């Protein structure tokens, strides 16, 4: 074979080149032996003795089958990749490799890493590599030379020559030491691979990992030793196991050790120069012609004649035999401990990597595979040892003598002894790292967590036990602790024997504990650790829902199989209610920490948070005395629960309610904003859709136009004819609509004429009533004269006649009410019928309008704009309101009729009683109503809450006129007529007595309201309240602007002018009316109620009388008779009233003397009529007096009704209403046009 020939040529060249250096090599060998026997060498190079071709019987197919067999149960992509790397790097030319099923993934990764530049191993010195740091990856420049074609086989051996020391042991010794393993340091090889265990068998590596160099020397990789740093402080002198024979041979082998060191330095320099040259060239150089040991062996062969060398060998043989026998026994005991040290180094190297990923994990499945592989290795070694022996003997016969073999065996035995001493040192170091306390008891674990949190004091050097590895998904973000301390840390559950809580261990602390105990796994094997805590901090978590413990430094004590008192453990906070109250008070602005030592928490938290001085509070200091409680209760802030000062803003008892309310408000605002945004988006979408539709319509129109242009002229003429016909039809339709509109207008005009006629009738009736009143007044004056003379005679007659007349009047009233009710029902039916006909007409008109609009849009005709038709569409809603109002009026009328009958009977009884008590001569207490004669002696304090005006019924009308006006008002209400034509409601600014609020302030508060003690007169509204009728002010109800109202606005203005003329005519006789007031105020009850009321206005600026607010037409004719307020003079009220009464008597007597002279004597028939009228007047006076007596005192005073014109303010109001109606019409019309346009 070609490889054998090459190896033989290389051997011959080595022999010729190295004859001159025999003497030097002998000295170096002696130094090597001394160094090896002493065991003080730290690092040794690989010594390659022999390489033989042992791989002739194996093929590539067997290699693949063995690989598939060994890794059939694993589906790991990284492992398959490593296999491919190893196959690419191991070149097979003529000889075939046999990689059996015992190959492990880390071994393949080793080969893959060796393929890099410089032998594949990092060039950093081993002394600088710490056991807890992985070396840096290879440089990018070196990766360019990793092609397998440019990597001959010798480079693999050269790389081992620079880093490892591989020696041979005889097959006999190897058979006894199948189970021994070497301590393999993987810190030099961890470039890209992640693996756990690197135990390589002494004999397994010789059979599994085989490579062929150019020289055909057989090699067996018996042992691979770890390279240790020079300064190894962990090795103790007591733990080193040295044989007895070793101490004797130290003095003899010192010279030999020096020679070995010198040879080693030369070999290292050679390998370094070779690797540098390889990097420069870009591919691997061939290996040296012969290894170092071959040179030495050939030099020894030439110097066999010297006796000094033979004497040294004999002494070494005797010493080594004794050492080997003892070392064999020690190796078997130590082999088990070697695994522990290798696992420690692995975990030291991989600890940071695993903690940074997920805080540790379980890799227990790999251990079973490793054990199965060890059994396969042992079985395979037995079969391959025979092959090694055969090839070894062939090499002896061909190239070496028996003497040379003996020398090599002795040297290798010496190296084995040195290996045994180094392994014992490493195992002793591992035992020293396990700081177990055999005297530890379970009673030593005492509870301390709860007391420390409640007292805020941390004890020194407490003991805890790890219960569980607490995998928190969320980040550990605590207040105060720096990220460097906890970002790579992990959390555990820790107990003190009674309570448990969360503890945070940095990676450095957890790694030290794992190394000290010697476990093979990272975090999950820490369950059961008993630790003495040396530095720690107790603090609240980021959510302030519990406490946590940060451990800065700890010491391993012991480990138990199960946690102590595991089933009875409780959480710290759940075990005590006091601690719950403490954590509730904590927040980001208020918290505290406790640490041991006390200054240790200042590293993470501010000083004001930690109790570094150990201040403690006693029970006496927490007691509050009664004096202090009283002083606190007396404070306004304490009682009112006001906010404290800014200094105490962040106190302990502050709650987060405000913060929650703010959050709710923010959420609500966000929701509103989202809704608004959604609405805006919807509007935008609608607008876009509309725009798209318009665009489509425009496009369609354009297309239609284009099509029309393309049409023939004949078709165009036909279309024009059709359009002309359509135009004619539309004109006919318009004419028909115009005729309908004219008819509708005619109907409207007829309806307005009917309304005018009804109003004229009402006015005629009113004028007749006014004439009758004038006649009745003249008759009254004549009758009063006769009554003064014939009272005594006529009293008895009057009483009898009054009874008959009262019955007749009641019958007449009932008949009138029936007639009025029938008339009202008939008018309502007519009104409903007219409305129904109008609605039908409106619906027909709408349909016609729609048809016209459609035709106008199609033909491009002008739009129709009819004001009258539009008015009909607007007023439909108002008509519905008027119908509801008419229903309400019917209900009120039915109630008033039922109640008036019951009350009329009661009033008739009261009249009889009061007529007996009447005295016509008691005129002393009468009071004139003119303000000029009212005394000004009343105090201003009695006038608070009252308002006065110069418009009062009593000042201008007699009681008889008031009664007649009220009766007419009732009749008109029952008949459904408008009561606002003759009687107008005064505004609240003009009403005199008993209003509840001022003009400026419209607030109806109870403080500003005033209830009068009495009333001088009773209005019609009060009588309705007493009689059961509705107290609703129909004038205050908003007027419905029906179609008739719009048409009759101008007619109402004409009616107002007629009213003004009537008022002027009626006000001519005002003087005579005022003179007759005293004759009508004869009852004592009326006088009593009149005295209690105040009649003088206030002197404030609000209540001054302005003539501008009065009716202008009335005072234009009677400016002389306008009453004016007099200045107040301090006089007693009683004397002033008497003087006023005496003056009134004098005026009445003078008027009575003048009247009979002017009036002629009337016939008897007229006298009878006058007597009947007087009786009626007396009855009316009796009813008023009875009502005054039974009138309840109400908070809201009555409104006064007087005969007058519209004031300026009322005119403004009516104009505003008209403007509003017009504006509404315009808005509706705009909307109507927009709808048509769309």
From Swiss-Prot:
Biased composition (Basic residues): 383-394
Regions of compositional bias (Low complexity) in chain numbering: 10-26, 129-149, 234-276, 417-435, 678-691, 712-792, 806-859, 882-906, 1062-1083, 1108-1121, 1142-1181
Chain intervals for the UniProt region annotation (Disordered): 1-38, 122-156, 229-439, 660-1016, 1051-1083, 1098-1191
GO cellular component: CAF-1 complex; nucleus
GO biological process terms on file: nucleosome assembly
Compositional bias per record (Acidic residues), positions renumbered to this chain: 362-372, 916-927, 976-990
Comp. bias regions, Basic and acidic residues: 344-361, 395-416, 793-805, 966-975
Bias (Polar residues) ranges: 317-343, 929-944, 1123-1133, 1182-1191
Domain of life according to the entry: Eukaryota
Name of the molecule in the record: Uncharacterized protein DDB_G0290301
Organism of derivation: Dictyostelium discoideum
